């Protein structure tokens, strides 16, 4: 039926607050939009006596396009009215490099890709350049991966020495579950057996043991788990085997030796910051020196691909604190550095007990990110993957930097969503990527998740396996 739409945005800017009212009046009750529909947006921003108006015209046959045009109009008006802009413009998704990658795969050159990202999302020049550069490096790395006949494996170890204030991942204090770790490994091995049998005809391209903190396991338990994986899967096509050692207070010589003798090619030693006061605030029960000594021990034992995670926007951290952290990291010369922007989720202690942290400053800016990028460049590291999350400090991003030949393949695969990832363990989420593309070039993705609670995972392991069976038996 005939329908006309009139969207009116009223935005009153008072002090530092913006109130938005968006009403849509539709005649005919039809939710679809008709061809050749003219839409007039009368948009008023009142700020210090000024009024800013805009009118746009769209072909309403494409709902997604119409939504994007409305977002652009609203964003542009708010930008004019407040004098403020966002580094990523209207982009709110977590994988901006997927857009740049799609442009490259469609044959666009750098200029055409830049113009598309600028015109479609109003992203800043810095973020567009970052996205294009990373997408090109990702494409070169992913050319080695067989999407259709390959897959990757994630193993979750949901235990930590303690829970960090910002963390919302599936993790539990080891002290509470110490007597059930072997039971957990029993259940995990059962899920590994199913996966190995189901995917025996596929190429295993990468393995990632994460958590939690995998090195909360004892040396014997680490050896047991990795030997189980090596005995269960054909690793001849495996490009990378990562164990996220993570917390320096969980790392010992014996554990590193267990990893080394089993051929682990990549590990993480994650300080998050090199400021001791911040470590104490966020509940990481280790010292700056623990990080330094753990890293040096790993180097001494021959690990030549070590990542270090850092977080921008932690409580009470200044730009000078970040500079101090990067100076110490530079002295260690890791092969990978991952710069995270603090993203506090509902389940994190920073949210649950927010009154305790309400007086603490948590700031991340483009200046912070640029400083980290400059230090990484000095270390010979280039950005190779990027992702975003809701509620990120400064509306920034997470960026992985790596030396030549040391980029994390699994990190790229999980962000680009081009290959199936089978995930085992409590709270692990399996992602099936269908090989036949949709008309728009994207791929259908289906998921199944394991229960998060360790006790439930142990007792319901058969059900977890059945979930995977249903996911992969669908034709």
Where are these regions (language model features)?
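Conserved non-cysteine loop/helix-boundary elements of the Radical SAM core domain that shape
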Residues: 171-372
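C-terminal accessory region of radical SAM enzymes
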Residues: 364-393, 422, 428-475
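Canonical Radical SAM [4Fe-4S] cluster-binding loop centered on the CxxxCxxC motif
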Residues: 148-183
């Amino acid at each position: 039926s005939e329908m006309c739409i009139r969207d009116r945005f009223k935005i009153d800017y008072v002090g530092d607050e913006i109130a938005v009212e968006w009403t849509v009046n539709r005649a005919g009750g039809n939710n679809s939009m008709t061809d050749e529909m003219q839409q007039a947006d009368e948009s008023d921003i009142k700020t210090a006596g000024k009024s800013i108006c805009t009118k746009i015209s769209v072909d309403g046959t494409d709902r997604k396009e119409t939504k994007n045009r409305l977002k652009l109009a609203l964003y542009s008006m708010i930008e004019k009215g407040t004098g403020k802009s966002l580094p990523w413009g209207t982009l709110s998704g977590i994988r901006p490099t997927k857009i740049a990658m799609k442009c490259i795969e469609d044959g666009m050159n750098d200029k055409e890709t830049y113009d598309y990202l600028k015109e479609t999302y109003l992203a800043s020049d810095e973020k567009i350049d970052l996205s294009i550069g990373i997408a090109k490096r990702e494409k070169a790395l992913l050319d080695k991966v067989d999407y259709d006949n390959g897959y990757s494996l994630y193993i979750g170890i949901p235990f930590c020495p303690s829970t960090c204030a910002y963390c919302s991942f599936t993790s539990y204090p080891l002290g509470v579950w110490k007597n059930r770790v072997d039971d957990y490994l029993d259940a995990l091995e059962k899920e590994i057996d199913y996966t190995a049998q189901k995917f025996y005809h596929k190429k295993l391209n990468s393995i990632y043991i994460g958590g939690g903190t995998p090195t909360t396991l004892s040396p014997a338990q680490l050896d047991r788990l990795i030997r189980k994986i090596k005995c269960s899967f054909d690793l001849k096509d495996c490009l990378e085997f990562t164990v996220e050692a993570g917390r320096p207070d969980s790392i010992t010589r014996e554990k590193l030796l267990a990893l080394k003798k089993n051929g682990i090619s990549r590990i993480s030693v994650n300080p998050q910051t090199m400021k001791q006061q911040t470590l104490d605030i966020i509940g990481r029960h280790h010292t700056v020196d623990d990080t330094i000594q753990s890293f040096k021990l790993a180097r001494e034992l021959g690990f030549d691909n070590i990542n270090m995670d850092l977080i921008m926007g932690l409580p009470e951290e200044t730009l000078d604190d970040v500079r101090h952290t990067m100076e110490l990291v530079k002295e260690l010369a890791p092969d990978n550095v991952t710069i995270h922007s603090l993203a506090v989720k509902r389940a994190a202690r920073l949210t649950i007990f927010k009154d305790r942290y309400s007086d603490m400053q948590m700031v991340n800016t483009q200046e912070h990110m640029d400083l980290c990028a400059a230090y990484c460049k000095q270390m010979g590291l280039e950005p190779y993957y990027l992702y975003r999350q809701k509620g990120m400090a400064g509306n920034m991003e997470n960026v992985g930097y790596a030396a030549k030949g040391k980029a994390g393949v699994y990190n790229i695969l999980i962000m680009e969503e081009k290959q199936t990832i089978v995930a085992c363990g409590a709270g692990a989420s399996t992602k099936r990527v269908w090989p036949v593309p949709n008309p728009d070039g994207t791929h259908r993705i289906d998921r199944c998740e394991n229960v998060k609670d360790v006790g439930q995972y142990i007792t319901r392991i058969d059900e977890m396996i059945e979930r995977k069976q249903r996911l992969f038996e669908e034709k």
